[in-house]
């Protein structure tokens, strides 16, 4: 029941983020211009490079707290959060100077038009405050995770998104539109989210109290040592996820990176959805590990890969299959020429993102060294390929996209299931089974998209939405009849009858 509630809340938050992106992007592009819009994401990417330092703590505190609390070791769990809070304050103070320096020297790192330089610098300064606030509050995310009430996190994220959008509209209406106003709006949303996170932390974990006697170098060292490989991994993640816009800016110019920033939002939303849904399976997998139930962990992990893949296959197929008409209707005919980029993104994301729930297995086992090294190496491969293919090979934005596709498939679809099978002691192919159903469903949905376009001209929002609904219905029937197990079909029918009975009442 909790999984259903958590899943529904996460799906609602994702749909809200899609709606807000579709609605806000054309507005911001038209208001600020394509070049300026590119710097909205680029400035945040620059700030996120500092997460290499902060992730050493933030990536492990939730896991350490949850395992200790599930085992009844409340004193130990209390100490983990207390040490995290103290260490995060100290690290934040140390980061103030380099964050400020990145703002003032940004024009030496990337191509920034002189007319936008002051705006970009102020945007980075405000974004730095947002970054530090998010880091400080990360420890309070342990409460919903420990209680397996992740719908609380999704609800807070939804509120944060709404506050951000409303703040952007208000600032643009009251002042001359600038890039920094978007960061200020994001900061306003983060402040509200922080207040809510703290409230629910105290409500879900009333036994926690910050005590000076819990602060110890030994506990902090334990967190840092466990998170050290997370920092190495984060370097690789940044080389995967947040180097493409910088590469486009340096190799192809501000205009090309602005266009790429507009369309890259949807692949990023798919990644976000995959990560969010994968996290829903993490509490149960952590619980299986804590109890030493490896058979249960293996079965649940395979189910997680298949369900995560099924959820991603539909939006990915819609994104790739309807890329041309979608970009034309959404941003104008000038963007339709880069529609194949979305098709490439959709194709490799279906294959690679389905395996993300498996990340939480090596986190539970505290076996992060090898994944971190592999992520770092393949992240470097991604950068080399992106620069080579976009520049010397003259493939432009397509080179950057292909580089990401090759690197991410190698990391997620090949290395991840093989490594997880090794640390759990199972055969190499065990964790590859879950991808077959989602992949076949994605191909089916993409085929339906193309078939409809041969019959009907899609040139307006109503026709695009109608096509999306039709494809979704066909996909649901295909997945229900051919991909879901007999037990899952019975469960769906049982809940449908229960819902129908409640409505009739």
UniProtKB/Swiss-Prot annotation:
<feature type="transmembrane region" description="Helical">
    <location>
        <begin position="371"/>
        <end position="391"/>
    </location>
</feature>
<feature type="transmembrane region" description="Helical">
    <location>
        <begin position="156"/>
        <end position="176"/>
    </location>
</feature>
<dbReference type="InterPro" id="IPR002797">
    <property type="entry name" value="Polysacc_synth"/>
</dbReference>
<keyword id="KW-1003">Cell membrane</keyword>
<keyword id="KW-0270">Exopolysaccharide synthesis</keyword>
<protein>
    <recommendedName>
        <fullName>Uncharacterized membrane protein EpsK</fullName>
    </recommendedName>
</protein>
<comment type="function">
    <text>May be involved in the production of the exopolysaccharide (EPS) component of the extracellular matrix during biofilm formation. EPS is responsible for the adhesion of chains of cells into bundles.</text>
</comment>
<dbReference type="Pfam" id="PF01943">
    <property type="entry name" value="Polysacc_synt"/>
</dbReference>
<feature type="transmembrane region" description="Helical">
    <location>
        <begin position="235"/>
        <end position="255"/>
    </location>
</feature>
<feature type="transmembrane region" description="Helical">
    <location>
        <begin position="261"/>
        <end position="281"/>
    </location>
</feature>
<feature type="transmembrane region" description="Helical">
    <location>
        <begin position="310"/>
        <end position="330"/>
    </location>
</feature>
<dbReference type="GO" id="GO:0005886">
    <property type="term" value="C:plasma membrane"/>
</dbReference>
<feature type="transmembrane region" description="Helical">
    <location>
        <begin position="464"/>
        <end position="484"/>
    </location>
</feature>
<feature type="transmembrane region" description="Helical">
    <location>
        <begin position="395"/>
        <end position="415"/>
    </location>
</feature>
<keyword id="KW-0812">Transmembrane</keyword>
<feature type="transmembrane region" description="Helical">
    <location>
        <begin position="435"/>
        <end position="455"/>
    </location>
</feature>
<feature type="transmembrane region" description="Helical">
    <location>
        <begin position="122"/>
        <end position="142"/>
    </location>
</feature>
<feature type="transmembrane region" description="Helical">
    <location>
        <begin position="86"/>
        <end position="106"/>
    </location>
</feature>
<feature type="transmembrane region" description="Helical">
    <location>
        <begin position="181"/>
        <end position="201"/>
    </location>
</feature>
<feature type="transmembrane region" description="Helical">
    <location>
        <begin position="341"/>
        <end position="361"/>
    </location>
</feature>
<keyword id="KW-1133">Transmembrane helix</keyword>
<dbReference type="InterPro" id="IPR050833">
    <property type="entry name" value="Poly_Biosynth_Transport"/>
</dbReference>
<dbReference type="GO" id="GO:0000271">
    <property type="term" value="P:polysaccharide biosynthetic process"/>
</dbReference>
<feature type="transmembrane region" description="Helical">
    <location>
        <begin position="9"/>
        <end position="29"/>
    </location>
</feature>
<feature type="transmembrane region" description="Helical">
    <location>
        <begin position="49"/>
        <end position="69"/>
    </location>
</feature>
<keyword id="KW-0472">Membrane</keyword>
């Amino acid at each position: 029941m909790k999984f259903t509630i958590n899943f529904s809340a996460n799906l609602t938050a994702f749909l809200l983020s899609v709606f807000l992106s579709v609605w806000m992007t054309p507005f911001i592009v038209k208001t600020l211009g394509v070049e300026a819009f590119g710097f909205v994401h680029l400035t945040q990417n620059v700030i996120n490079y500092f997460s290499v330092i902060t992730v050493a703590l933030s990536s492990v505190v939730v896991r350490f707290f949850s395992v200790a609390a599930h085992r009844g070791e409340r004193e130990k769990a209390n100490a983990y959060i207390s040490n995290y809070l103290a260490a995060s304050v100290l690290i934040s103070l140390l980061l103030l100077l380099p964050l400020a320096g990145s703002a003032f020297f940004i024009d030496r790192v990337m191509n920034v038009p002189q007319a936008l330089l002051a705006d970009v610098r102020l945007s980075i300064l405000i974004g730095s405050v947002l970054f530090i606030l998010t880091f400080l509050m990360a420890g309070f995310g342990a409460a919903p995770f420990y209680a397996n009430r992740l719908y609380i996190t999704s609800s807070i994220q939804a509120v944060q998104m709404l506050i951000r959008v409303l703040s952007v509209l208000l600032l643009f209406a009251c002042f001359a539109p600038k890039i920094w106003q978007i960061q200020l709006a994001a900061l306003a949303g983060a402040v509200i989210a922080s207040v809510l996170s703290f409230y629910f932390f105290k409500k879900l974990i009333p036994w926690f109290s910050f005590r000076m006697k819990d602060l110890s170098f030994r506990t902090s060292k334990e967190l840092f040592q466990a998170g050290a490989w997370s920092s190495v991994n984060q370097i690789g993640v940044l080389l995967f996820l947040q180097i493409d816009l910088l590469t486009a800016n340096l190799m192809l110019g501000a205009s090309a990176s602005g266009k790429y920033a507009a369309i890259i939002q949807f692949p990023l939303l798919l990644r976000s959805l995959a990560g969010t849904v994968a996290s829903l399976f993490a509490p149960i997998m952590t619980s299986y590990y804590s109890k030493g139930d490896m058979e249960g962990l293996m079965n649940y992990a395979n189910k997680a890969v298949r369900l995560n893949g099924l959820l991603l296959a539909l939006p990915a197929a819609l994104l790739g299959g309807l890329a041309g008409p979608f970009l034309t209707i959404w941003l104008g005919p000038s963007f339709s020429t880069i529609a194949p980029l979305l098709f490439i993104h959709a194709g490799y994301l279906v294959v690679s993102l389905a395996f993300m729930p498996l990340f939480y297995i090596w986190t539970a086992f505290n076996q992060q060294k090898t994944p971190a090294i592999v992520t770092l190496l393949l992240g470097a491969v991604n950068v080399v390929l992106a620069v080579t293919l976009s520049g010397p090979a003259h493939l432009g934005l397509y080179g950057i996209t292909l580089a990401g596709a090759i690197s991410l498939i190698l990391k997620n679809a090949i290395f991840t299931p093989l490594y997880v099978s090794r640390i759990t002691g199972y055969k190499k192919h065990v964790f590859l089974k879950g991808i077959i159903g989602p992949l076949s469903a994605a191909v089916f949905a993409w085929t339906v998209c193309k078939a409809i376009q041969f019959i009907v001209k899609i040139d307006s929002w109503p026709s695009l939405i109608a096509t999306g609904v039709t494809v979704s219905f066909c996909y649901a029937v295909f997945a229900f009849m051919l991909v879901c197990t007999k037990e899952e079909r019975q469960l769906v029918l049982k809940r449908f009858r229960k819902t129908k009975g409640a409505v009739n009442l």
